[in-house]
Amino acid sequence: YFDRMLLLNLLGSYRMNIALFPPLLGVLGMIAAFVVYLLVMRYPDGEDKVKKIGDQIHAGALAFMKTEYKYLTVFIILLVFLSQVFLGTETAIAVVVGAACSSLAGFIGMYAATKANVRTATAAQKDGGAAALSVSFYGGSVMGLCVASLGLIGLG
């Protein structure tokens, strides 16, 4: 009897430790996304004219995101209210956390992508298509890492 109880206690502790893996891996993924972003930012961003156009694209994208998030906030508030009324508090909290993580991933992805665009154009101009593909791949991977990592954090 004692051996079985000890084994069950050990297994229970083991399961609790396994439950920590998804959020822990999510945090590691966010760190990896930040490192990849820093690597992308090390690529040259071109001459003054290219920088100016890139800055305008970046500003326009962020203005678009700001407007989009205003409209989404209204929808999310409505969805949270309906979730609370019909499905309960836990579901409403899950909707809030999911919407926040999705919004954060979208913002980080848009920010990184618009910064990578000008570097991709500069790499294509100076070093050719292979270099441009490399820069654009890393720029896009920031978004992918954020989506996957925030999803893992949300499982915690």
What are the roles of these predicted feature ranges?
Residues 16-156:
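Hydrophobic, small-residue-rich transmembrane alpha-helices and their short perimembrane loops
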Residues 1-15:
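Short, Lys/Arg-enriched N-terminal segments with co-localized hydrophobic residues
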